[in-house]
Every structure is written in structure tokens, then in C-alpha cells.
């Protein structure tokens, strides 16, 4: 999972991580701040779960930096890799959704679940929504569905 530290976003990451580690036994769950995730991490991954915030109708700068640094190093090397995405958007998440879909398409990765957009003022239900998306993704990987 690639995620940037922020108070509520960090809370989501913590709860998702705890749930994944307690509910999956055959997966090696690695969580990295996007500034520290690198090409080797992507090449070793069987799937990628991306959590990002939306800032000014665009994906967080940390997430953009992650793709800028790694895009050309992994293009054509991880075609078909399953991906799931959640976006914490104060407004509507449209800009980040468009960007994420474009990048995923360019890398020829597979978006295996609809992008989850947690929009509007912070709500505790965002945690459960992100857990459900993440757990479904992890179970799909663990079961070789993807």
C-alpha cells in the first residue's frame, strides 16, 4: 500500500493495515510512504493498493511523485498487475480519479475494483469503506482471483 501521512489518512492506513494483517495469512503486506516506495517495490509486488488524498482537484503531490519516479522504470514490466485505489477527497475526487485511471491504463495495470472516493467532510465510515475495499483486494490476491 502506498500512502502519505496525514491525520485522518494515517488513521485509515493504520486500520486497513491491522485488518489486512489479521485477516490474510498468505500475503506479505508492505506499507510505504510514496516518497520511499521505489521501482524494486513495484517489481516485487503481486498487486498494488494505492491510498491518496486529493488536493486542489489533483492527486496528492506525494502520489504524483511516486508515479513520476517509477513510471518509466516499470512500464511494460508489470502489465496486468492488479490495482485498487481509494481517494480521500474533500470535494468530489473527479480529478484524481481521472489521473489514476489514466496512469493505470498507461502502465497496462488492471483496476480490479471501482475506485473508492471518500468525499466530503471527514466521516468515520471512511475507515470501514477503505477496509472493505482493501480486504476484498487482498482476498482476491490471496485467492489468485486476480
Predicted segment positions?
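Short, small-residue-biased leader/transition segments that mark boundaries at the very start
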Residues: 1-3
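Short helix-loop-beta junction
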Residues: 14-26, 105-110
Amino acid at each position: 500500500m502506498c500512502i502519505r501521512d496525514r491525520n485522518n489518512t494515517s488513521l485509515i492506513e493504520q486500520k486497513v493495515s491491522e485488518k489486512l494483517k489479521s485477516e490474510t495469512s498468505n500475503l506479505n503486506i508492505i506499507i510505504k510512504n510514496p516518497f520511499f516506495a521505489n521501482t524494486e517495490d513495484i517489481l516485487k509486488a503481486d498487486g498494488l493498493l494505492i491510498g491518496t488524498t486529493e488536493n486542489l482537484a489533483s492527486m496528492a503531490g506525494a502520489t504524483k511523485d511516486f508515479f513520476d519516479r517509477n513510471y518509466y522504470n516499470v512500464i511494460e514490466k508489470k502489465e496486468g498487475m492488479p490495482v485498487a485505489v481509494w481517494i480521500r477527497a474533500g470535494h468530489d475526487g473527479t480529478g484524481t480519479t481521472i489521473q489514476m485511471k489514466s496512469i493505470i491504463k498507461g502502465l497496462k495495470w488492471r483496476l480490479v475494483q471501482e475506485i473508492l472516493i471518500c468525499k466530503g467532510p471527514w466521516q468515520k465510515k471512511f475507515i470501514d469503506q477503505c477496509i472493505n475495499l482493501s480486504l476484498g483486494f487482498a482476498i482476491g490476491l490471496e485467492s489468485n482471483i486476480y
